[in-house]
């Protein structure tokens, strides 16, 4: 049974830790293991209890615990979770809760569906000034669609006889 608990320990140790060798588990993943395996029930064992036990079993300046320290932590949490049982029975009860469990990814942000994107990028539904930026096929006009181009011909704006000067002098 300890081997199944060890496999669960390794699965949680590498969860979300790309640099982890699965030999040691961080406090974050230890808390996740306790929560996902229903060791932390919110009444007898709370997240505070889990953090305190983790700090108690780890070395002074370490940030992780190995499997042996993990077993000590589970023994302490087991006594809190299964009151009235001796430490070995409590440990076996905790290991039974851990059997076959994997890190859960519920509540993780999913990618959005395409429906909203299609609606927002349909240029045929654009109105006002945004409509001017695209031609009938939906292709962007580029700079002509974004800003009014100035007439640099030298004539005053609104002058009707633009381009007729050379024709009059000949």
Curated annotation (Swiss-Prot):
GO cellular component annotations of the record: cytosol; sperm flagellum
Tissue: Only expressed in male reproductive organs, including testis. Expressed in elongating spermatids at stages IV-VIII of the seminiferous epithelial cycle in testis and in mature sperm in the epididymis.
Keywords on record: Cell projection, Cilium, Cytoplasm, Differentiation, Flagellum, Spermatogenesis
Disruption phenotype: Male subfertility with a significantly decreased sperm count and motility. Sperm shows increased irregular mitochondria lacking lamellar cristae, abnormal expression of electron transfer chain molecules, lower ATP levels, decreased mitochondrial membrane potential and increased apoptotic index.
Database matches in Pfam families: p25-alpha (PF05517)
Ranges where the record places region Disordered: 105-170
GO function terms (MF aspect): tubulin binding
Entry superkingdom: Eukaryota
Sequence ranges of Basic and acidic residues compositional bias: 129-149
Record field: compositional bias (Low complexity): 105-117
Protein's GO biological process: cell differentiation; microtubule polymerization; regulation of flagellated sperm motility; spermatogenesis
Family to which the UniProt record says this protein belongs: Belongs to the TPPP family.
Function field: Probable regulator of microtubule dynamics required for sperm motility. In contrast to other members of the family, has no microtubule bundling activity.
Protein name, UniProt field: Tubulin polymerization-promoting protein family member 2
Origin species: Mus musculus
Name of encoding gene: Tppp2
């Amino acid at each position: 049974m300890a081997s199944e608990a060890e496999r669960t320990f390794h699965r949680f140790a590498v969860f979300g830790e790309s640099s982890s060798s699965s030999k040691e588990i961080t406090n974050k993943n230890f808390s996740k293991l306790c929560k996902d395996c229903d060791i932390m029930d919110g009444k007898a064992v709370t997240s505070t209890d889990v953090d305190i036990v983790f700090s108690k079993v780890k070395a002074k300046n370490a940030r992780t615990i190995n499997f042996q320290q993990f077993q000590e932590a589970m023994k302490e949490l087991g006594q809190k979770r299964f009151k009235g049982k001796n430490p070995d029975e409590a440990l076996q009860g905790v290991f039974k809760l851990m059997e076959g469990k994997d890190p859960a990814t519920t509540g993780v942000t999913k990618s959005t569906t395409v429906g909203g994107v299609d609606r927002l990028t349909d240029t045929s539904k654009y109105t006002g000034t945004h409509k001017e930026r695209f031609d009938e096929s939906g292709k962007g006009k580029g700079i002509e669609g974004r800003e009014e181009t100035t007439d640099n011909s030298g004539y005053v704006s609104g002058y009707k006889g633009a381009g007729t000067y050379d024709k009059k002098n000949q």
